[in-house]
């Protein structure tokens, strides 16, 4: 059989990237509302551009929230604190245009209303969960290192190690795979916004020494590994001044970095009655437990819903030929072990908490924080028992 030898690439963006600023603002508003009202319906979209943030969407809640204050606090924490950057938390305009959720949607989602009395899905759609055994977190290696690089960029910016950095940055990691196993890092790309006076050599040396070499293990690099640092040579104008930012524009960064499939629905700004978010988290929980239980080395789970209907219309699993038992049996085990109805997902993963701002930068998956309940592997024993392994 022919040996598979290829290079796969994933990217990440930092908390200061304009699309990520928008995601974090949307989720900060969601958290502020959930703190007061767990039954709120929230669909909050954010646009950020030079000197301005626009908040729009459909929100039905009893909570009283100072939206402009939440927006400004979020922008301040990210680090846009100087109008020389083209975006400043104190002086930017904040426009708010919020409507209520449509009663036609509400009756399908609210328990006891609509054609089906159970809490139904907030929309139709398909969602995917993914896990693989490339890293201890059971995530693809390319996306994990991409996220760690952007996190490290933010860390050295905020603690003053590289005080010439500004909030907007991106990373990209290309890894060589042989027979679907990661063997070496081929290319690392980092672009980071910086102050105007710093030299290119200072930026390049600082990022390679304080970021790349602190994150990428030496055993994964060789003399052919390339570091492309700010390859245009200059990145002073960035953030919302450089590019308009919108909620939901970084869905692959948010998930698995191009590994597996994606149903197209974004996460940020949505309360967990929206299956775009809650069912994607559940898909990760299912896939991670199946891989952790040893049923497969790689696992992709698809679930699909109809608006207003609680039970998923389909559940599919694909192990890419790595399954210890047939995929049809794994799909049955998923149905037996995991309750995939929207209300049950919310209860199992305890999703009515103000935890979402934390998810909105550096990936929704693979970070084993206490709030990220979908990263637990607490179903291993029952899965193994049912699989007979």
UniProtKB/Swiss-Prot annotation:
A Gene Ontology biological process term: S-adenosylmethionine biosynthetic process
Function, as annotated: Catalyzes the formation of S-adenosylmethionine (AdoMet) from methionine and ATP. The overall synthetic reaction is composed of two sequential steps, AdoMet formation and the subsequent tripolyphosphate hydrolysis which occurs prior to release of AdoMet from the enzyme.
Enzyme class: transferase
GO cellular component: cytosol
Protein localization: Cytoplasm
UniProt protein name: S-adenosylmethionine synthase
PROSITE patterns for this protein: ADOMET_SYNTHASE_1 (PS00376), ADOMET_SYNTHASE_2 (PS00377)
Organism field: Geobacter sulfurreducens (strain ATCC 51573 / DSM 12127 / PCA)
Pathway connected to this protein: Amino-acid biosynthesis; S-adenosyl-L-methionine biosynthesis; S-adenosyl-L-methionine from L-methionine: step 1/1
Disulfide-linked positions: none
UniProt GO MF annotations: ATP binding; magnesium ion binding; methionine adenosyltransferase activity
Binding site for Mg(2+): 19
Gene from which the chain derives: metK
Region feature (Flexible loop): 101-111
Keywords: ATP-binding, Cytoplasm, Magnesium, Metal-binding, Nucleotide-binding, One-carbon metabolism, Potassium, Transferase
Residues the entry annotates as binding K(+): 45
Protein family per UniProt: Belongs to the AdoMet synthase family.
Cofactor binding note of this UniProt entry: Binds 2 divalent ions per subunit.
């Amino acid at each position: 059989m022919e040996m598979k030898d290829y290079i796969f690439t994933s990217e990440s963006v930092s908390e200061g990237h304009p699309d990520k600023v928008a995601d974090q603002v949307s989720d900060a508003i969601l958290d502020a509302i959930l703190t007061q009202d767990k039954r709120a319906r929230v669909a909050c979209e954010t646009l950020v551009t030079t000197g301005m943030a626009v908040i729009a969407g459909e929100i039905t809640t009893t909570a009283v929230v100072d939206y402009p204050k939440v927006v400004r606090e979020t922008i301040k924490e990210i680090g846009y604190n100087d109008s020389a950057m083209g975006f400043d938390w104190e002086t930017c305009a904040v426009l708010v245009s919020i409507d209520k959720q449509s009663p036609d949607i509400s009756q399908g989602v609210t328990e006891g209303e609509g054609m089906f009395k159970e809490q139904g899905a907030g929309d139709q759609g398909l969602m995917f969960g993914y896990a693989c055994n490339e890293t201890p977190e059971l995530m693809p290696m390319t996306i994990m290192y991409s996220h760690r690089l952007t996190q490290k960029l933010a860390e050295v910016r905020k603690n003053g190690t590289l005080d010439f950095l500004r909030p907007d940055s991106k990373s990209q990691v290309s890894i060589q795979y042989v027979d679907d196993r990661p063997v070496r890092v081929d290319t690392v790309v980092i672009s980071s916004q910086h102050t105007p006076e710093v030299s290119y050599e200072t930026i390049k040396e600082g990022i390679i020494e304080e970021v790349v070499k602190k994150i990428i293990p030496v055993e994964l690099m060789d003399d052919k590994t390339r570091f492309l640092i700010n390859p245009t040579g200059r990145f002073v104008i960035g953030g919302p001044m450089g590019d308009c930012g919108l909620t939901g524009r970084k869905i692959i960064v948010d998930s698995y970095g191009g590994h597996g499939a994606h149903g197209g629905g974004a996460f940020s700004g949505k309360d967990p009655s929206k299956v775009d978010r809650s069912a994607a988290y559940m898909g990760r929980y299912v896939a991670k437990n199946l891989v952790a239980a040893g049923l497969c080395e790689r696992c992709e789970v698809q679930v699909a819903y109809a608006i207003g209907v609680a039970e998923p219309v389909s559940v599919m699993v694909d192990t890419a030929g790595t399954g210890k038992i047939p995929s049809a049996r794994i799909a049955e085990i998923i149905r037996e072990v995991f309750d995939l109805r929207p209300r049950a997902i919310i209860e199992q993963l305890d999703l009515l908490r103000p935890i979402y701002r934390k998810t909105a930068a550096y990936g929704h998956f693979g970070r084993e924080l206490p709030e990220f309940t979908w990263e637990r592997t607490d179903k291993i024993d029952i899965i193994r028992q049912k699989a007979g392994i």
